[in-house]
């Protein structure tokens, strides 16, 4: 079950005049965002060379050392480390345990680069400590928590408030050398339609905060129009998530059913061709949300042999690299 974080209300009241000014200012910046930014989306390397990080949620049945060793042996660039409630590193223990996790990673040649968090509020002390600790250890990108649209507030009003919230978070990120990435997630989350993120991210400088584009969730929500969403959000993409799905009946209801890569509805040939066309080559987080004996849900004890989990991880990684190479 997806958990959403209820956001604190902005203490500063918005007059209708100020709201209109903020909205127009955010929208007015959209055509310029990203294209002239020196940090825009591109890692300086060959277009055929990608960095693939394994989402550590799927290895939470392992110690830090075993997690790092297995990830290195499977051929990943590194880990997208879960630093959140029920993650590999709990936020309240981040100062003690994140250095331990990083030490284990570095012992096997894995750089600290990506992490997944519940961070959303630059003024929250625990969240600040998470970012400060990560910045000191060399992380560069993190996924934020998710936002929702409260019923008691209009969506445009929420977008304006969240735009200011992200602008404040970006200021903190800048001092720490971190890039915050908001993931589009299917359902009633902010960002599910993709288009609704434009005024929110458009209120920022698009340097130290942006989008973590998730093609699986984009296709669930966008169907055959997902390309338009990608085209609109592309100036803001700072990292991406890779996974696959198909529609199926579950207990009599049609629902998205997660699958291994290449066995679902995501058109990876077209998707990767567009990423190359748009010159988007950012860190990739590989997720495996289909049945892996509980590893898909972040279980600390799994019901299948760990070698079967590793086998599927290597299979998805091989598919991903081959599909990227073949895309034109």
Predicted regions and their residues:
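A short acidic, helix-capping loop that chelates divalent metal ions and anchors anionic groups
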Residues: 86-90, 150-154, 221, 294-295
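Catalytic domains of carbohydrate-active enzymes, especially glycoside hydrolases
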Residues: 67-84, 137-138
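Charged helix-capping and loop-helix junction motifs
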Residues: 94-99, 128-129, 158-166, 194-196, ...
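Histidine-acidic metal/acid-base catalytic patches
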Residues: 2-51, 62-72, 135, 194-209, ...
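Glycine-rich, proline-tolerant flexible connector loops at the mouths of alpha/beta enzymes
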Residues: 82-100
């Amino acid at each position: 079950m997806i958990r959403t974080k209820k956001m604190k209300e902005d203490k500063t009241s918005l007059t209708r005049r100020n709201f209109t000014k903020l909205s127009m200012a955010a929208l007015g910046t959209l055509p310029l965002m990203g294209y002239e930014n020196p940090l825009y989306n591109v890692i300086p390397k060959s277009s055929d060379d990608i960095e693939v990080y394994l989402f550590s949620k799927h290895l939470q049945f392992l110690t830090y050392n075993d997690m790092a060793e297995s990830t290195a042996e499977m051929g990943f660039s590194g880990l997208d480390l879960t630093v959140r409630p029920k993650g590999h590193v709990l936020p309240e223990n981040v100062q003690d345990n994140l250095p331990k996790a990083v030490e284990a990673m570095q012992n096997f040649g894995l750089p600290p680069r990506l992490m997944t968090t519940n961070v959303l509020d630059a003024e929250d002390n625990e969240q600040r400590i998470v970012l400060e600790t990560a910045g000191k250890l060399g992380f560069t990108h993190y996924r934020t928590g998710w936002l929702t649209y409260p019923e008691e507030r209009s969506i445009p009003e929420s977008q304006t408030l969240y735009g200011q919230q992200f602008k404040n978070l970006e200021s903190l990120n800048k001092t720490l050398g971190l890039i915050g990435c908001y993931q589009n997630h299917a359902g009633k989350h902010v960002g599910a339609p993709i288009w609704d993120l434009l005024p929110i991210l458009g209120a920022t400088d698009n340097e130290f905060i942006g989008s973590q584009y998730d093609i699986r969730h984009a296709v669930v929500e966008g169907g055959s129009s997902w390309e338009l969403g990608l085209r609109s959000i592309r100036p803001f993409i700072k990292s991406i998530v890779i996974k696959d799905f198909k529609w199926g009946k579950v207990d009599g209801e049609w629902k998205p059913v997660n699958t291994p890569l290449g066995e679902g509805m995501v058109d990876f040939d077209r998707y990767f061709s567009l990423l190359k066309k748009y010159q988007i080559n950012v860190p990739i987080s590989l997720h495996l949300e289909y049945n892996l004996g509980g590893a898909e849900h972040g279980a600390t004890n799994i019901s299948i042999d760990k070698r079967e989990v590793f086998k599927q991880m290597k299979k998805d990684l091989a598919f991903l690299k081959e599909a990227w190479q073949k895309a034109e």
